[in-house]
Amino acid sequence: MNNNYYGSPLSPEELQHQMHQHQQQQQQQQQQQQQQQQQQQQQQQQQQQQHQHQQQQKTNQHRNAGMMNTPPTTNQGNSTIHASDVTMSGGSDSLDEIIQQNLDEMHRRRSVPQPYGGQTRRLSMFDYANPNDGFSDYQLDNMSGNYGDMTGGMGMSGHSSPYAGQNIMAMSDHSGGYSHMSPNVMGNMMTYPNLNMYHSPPIENPYSSAGLDTIRTDFSMDMNMDSGSVSAASVHPTPGLNKQDDEMMTMEQGFGGGDDANASHQAQQNMGGLTPAMTPAMTPAMTPGVSNFAQGMATPVSQDAASTPATTFQSPSLSATTQTIRIGPPPPPSVTNAPTPAPFTSTPSGGGASQTKSIYSKSGFDMLRALWYVASRKDPKLKLGAVDMSCAFVVCDVTLNDCPIIYVSDNFQNLTGYSRHEIVGRNCRFLQAPDGNVEAGTKREFVENNAVYTLKKTIAEGQEIQQSLINYRKGGKPFLNLLTMIPIPWDTEEIRYFIGFQIDLVECPDAIIGQEGNGPMQVNYTHSDIGQYIWTPPTQKQLEPADGQTLGVDDVSTLLQQCNSKGVASDWHKQSWDKMLLENADDVVHVLSLKGLFLYLSPACKKVLEYDASDLVGTSLSSICHPSDIVPVTRELKEAQQHTPVNIVFRIRRKNSGYTWFESHGTLFNEQGKGRKCIILVGRKRPVFALHRKDLELNGGIGDSEIWTKVSTSGMFLFVSSNVRSLLDLLPENLQGTSMQDLMRKESRAEFGRTIEKARKGKIASCKHEVQNKRGQVLQAYTTFYPGDGGEGQRPTFLLAQTKLLKASSRTLAPATVTVKNMSPGGVPLSPMKGIQTDSDSNTLMGGMSKSGSSDSTGAMVSARSSAGPGQDAALDADNIFDELKTTRCTSWQYELRQMEKVNRMLAEELAQLLSNKKKRKRRKGGGNMVRDCANCHTRNTPEWRRGPSGNRDLCNSCGLRWAKQTGRVSPRTSSRGGNGDSMSKKSNSPSHSSPLHREVGNDSPSTTTATKNSPSLRGSSTTAPGTITTDSGPAVASSASGTGSTTIATSANSAASTVNALGPPATGPSGGSPAQHLPPHLQGTHLNAQAMQRVHQHKQHQQHQQQHQQQHQQQHQQQHQQLQQHQFNPPQSQPLLEGGSGFRGSGMEMTSIREEMGEHQQGLSV
């Protein structure tokens, strides 16, 4: 036997099988022993008769010697005396009693196996008269000790020969073999290390481990109770005993090595000199039928009666090493309260964790240990029935991400049709769909969703569960699976693995053993023979060498293995490599002549175009090209030049599936020396834009202030519309190839990632996020993703993104004193103008395709995939906005593009004419006698009108410069028209002409304040007056009266919208109310602080006091205006729809003249 063998625990099935064999062997041995006993009994009877005969002869001799002088008697008297002598000598005992006495003596003598010398051993211990009897002095009295004084002088001469017996310790019940032996004798018997029977002091191993045979893995101890044998993985050799009896132990006593080896152990068999520290300590009783061995024969054994059937061994010879082995067989099915066994832990002398090498397991997973944990788990709620390696089961690791499968049985592969390589590493949910693709967290379509949820919830709680549900084999064939999930620990007390047992209840209806009420079913998961389910894929005609496929799979694999990028390849390898790429490419590599004839097609033609290469070679491209695309395609081929790329997009007719968009990209090749020219192209199917009109209208339609982009499914820009220049001040070509997340802040990227994940699945998804323009300003945006090339619910190859810039009031800015709830008019998006498109929009709709017929690599109406989705044709036939891209349209896309450009140009001209007519009507209607004056100093002559606190040009040049310096915004501007500067306002960089966000962020402080002193002008006013009011939409002016005198501020109608002096007409009459009720519309609903509210109230009282003075000077102003009107031009018109403007009632000027505003306001304000 091999002394270095490290065995592993056997499965319960194997243990039961071995135990059954051992029992059969024991029965055979018992029969042999009975035969031997019968022979021995016969010999004993003969010896008994001889002994009686000898005693009779001796008695007769003594009698004859004492009766020499006595007269002889009759033969009858002699016969009577002989009979009495026989009776006195025990001749009256029956044969059964004699046999029982011999058996008892034999059991008592052999309770402690030991070698004997060569002298004759008499089977009867009552042969006291024999002088050669070595047991004549055997003491039958009760023992007074435990042989503590026994020394090495105990006679054990001779050699012990090895016995080849079975490694089974079969001990019977205590009442069977020791019925006639005193209990005191049994209690004081000398303990042997391998006899786990009764209380005994510890004893050290008297044998050295060197030279001893190791105990085999099937070594077990049978206590004849209710459990089977146990395997033990011995780490060190263990000598055994091999003397066999009916009800005695059976151990191997062969030390191996012959007489020399036995002689070397003879000196170690002395039982004396044992110290208490080396004696084994054993617990009161053994848990039924379990005893494990490791380290050596005499290792101390300790076992707790209340613990699991596992034994801990520790070798006394290894002082610095502690090894704990806890293994044991599972309890019988009737035992349900056995605790889960502790894991196997081993610490070698080096201190590190030992790693057991997997010699026999290819997967490296200890399945026997896992099944043992299943059988010996704590408080089992499900009865599995019989389990062996023929079951279909998998093992999942719950500590890894998504609980992947780490082990799969052979019958599970046969049951599902999937191979081991297709199963390991995946979650078990792949069986819940016919195609094997099921995403986590999604609603199940082919399986009962509630059953799956219950299964998931129970597994998350770490509980056992039995669930029947529909699963699908490879290829989509369903079967009714009865699934049982059992959690088991491993190295710690926590749950590590889940073992799932499966069985097809339709094919194996007899597997259900029984069911207790409405509880779980007891199932026999074992299979006698299960046929392998083999999935047969749809038959497809394989490419033959005639189609150009000359390299087989083995050749391609060899080339890939021999590929070395650093080394120098030979010409043969280069040619083979090029040939491999050509024949295995997904794209159709084709060669065309200048006239459009096919000269070569790669084998991918069969997959993409459904034609065999031989069917198209020699034919013209026009035979499979759409009739409307023949002219532009032929023109592109004839105009091809060397070193110039050729890119043609046209509709090609497939053999069975109709027309599809096809793009070919290549160049002209000129063969040197022969003058032959051809065009080498690489073509692939290209899905085009497909967007339903109803989907677009449900999400807000098309507006002006929005950006349309084509993005990949990962969020990378493939094409950007041209209006990104005016909205974000960025160039489209700089954005192409970058990610949309680069324009966002980190806070918005997480939500954006979740939204694009939904869009990747074919759903229309929207999210609100933030974008940054070129200056780094943060703008609020709202992006909606549409499936680019198919309907909703189908996985697209690219996405269409509609990004709308939101209103200024929703932007994130620094806090101000007054928070305006109402949205600023400048941030309201314009109403969409349906049917109006510009030239840039037309290029956007066509995906950036150039007018000459070619397209950009990132902006063409192409995607990153090689084939369109299953719904491409259906999406194009539906209510598609891109109706011009239908494959069945009778015109070419170049013609449609030219027509669209023409229509857009006509619409733009018509729009310009309408706007011009609107300006003329406003100018004719607004012709009045009002003359513009400065809102601060009231001057009417100035070289340029500048912007003031209201955002309008209501300040003269000097006052406007002071205001700009005070607020830190100096706008250098030259005027080409004296007195009127509004003509340059459209191209101005003034904060009022920029976006409201620019005006707000441009402020150095959270609020912009303006103070007015007692003087009628703003000269020298550099401090901030108390009572300042600030809004998110722009600065405001606060005025205060301090000291003596009065402050007079005469404002025109242009400044009445944002200054406090023009907050509204005085409340005259019973409907008067709080000052907040008379705020202009753009300040309605605002929250003013207490100081500002008090200042407004004081201002209204001041207005009522000065109303009388205003009425007196009103006539004088009118006369002066009439006189000046004859010498000056009409005041310039305000810019229509001024972005961010805050004119009267919070709106822009909207091409309304100053006189109209004055007419609505009825009167100016002066103090």
From Swiss-Prot:
**Which residue intervals are annotated with compositional bias (Polar residues) in the record?**
70-91, 307-325, 968-977, 1004-1033
Task: Fill in the PTM field for this protein.
Answer: FMN binds covalently to cysteine after exposure to blue light and is reversed in the dark.
Q: Name one GO cellular component term.
A: nucleus
Alphabetically ordered keywords of this record: Activator, Chromophore, DNA-binding, Flavoprotein, FMN, Metal-binding, Nucleus, Photoreceptor protein, Receptor, Repeat, Sensory transduction, Transcription, Transcription regulation, Zinc, Zinc-finger
Q: Name one GO biological process term.
A: regulation of DNA-templated transcription
Report a single Gene Ontology molecular function: zinc ion binding
Positions carrying S-4a-FMN cysteine: 428
Q: What induces the gene encoding this protein?
A: By blue light.
Question: Could you tell me which InterPro entries the record lists for this protein?
Answer: PAC, PAS, PAS-like_dom_sf, PAS_fold_3, Znf_GATA, Znf_NHR/GATA
Q: Give residue ranges for domain PAC.
A: 469-508, 650-691
Q: What CDD domains does the record tag this protein with?
A: PAS, ZnF_GATA
Where does the UniProt annotation locate this protein? Nucleus
State the residue spans of region: Disordered.
Answer: 1-91, 307-355, 849-872, 918-952, 966-1047, 1060-1167
Q: Where are the zinc fingers (GATA-type)?
A: 934-959
Q: Which residues form the PAS domain?
A: 381-452, 574-644, 693-763
Q: What is known of its domains?
A: The glutamine-rich domain might function in activating gene expression.
Its quaternary organisation is: Heterodimer of wc-1 and wc-2.
Function of the protein: May function as a transcription factor involved in light regulation. Binds and affects blue light regulation of the al-3 gene. Wc-1 and wc-2 proteins interact via homologous PAS domains, bind to promoters of light regulated genes such as frq, and activate transcription.
Q: Can you say what this protein is called?
A: White collar 1 protein
Q: Which organism is it from?
A: Neurospora crassa (strain ATCC 24698 / 74-OR23-1A / CBS 708.71 / DSM 1257 / FGSC 987)
